[in-house]
Amino acid sequence: MAHDMDRLLEMSDEIWEGSILPSLSEFIGVKALSPLFEPDWEEVGELEDVIELFCRWVDNQGIRGLSYSVHRIEGRSPVLLISVEGSGKGEIIFYSHLDKQPS
């Protein structure tokens, strides 16, 4: 099946400009330092803000088969788990984090 490369690039640019870049800018705007660099992270609440921001972004993507859950343990930073039903055999695990470290 041949793809129209110009249309694919156009769609990619639209998604980047319309969804990814604004969301990334909003994410970067939240300080959300790692607990190692912000001992009062629970009181500051920025890690919770980032989790909520990311959950809203995930909700807006409309990805079929996607589910997520936020796990909290007292005294530990929250964990966001995202699952997407696959279309083939096997599993993939991707790890990332939403906190930041100062430069």
Predicted regions and their residues:
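Acidic/His- and Gly-rich active-site-bordering loop/insert found
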Residues: A2-S103
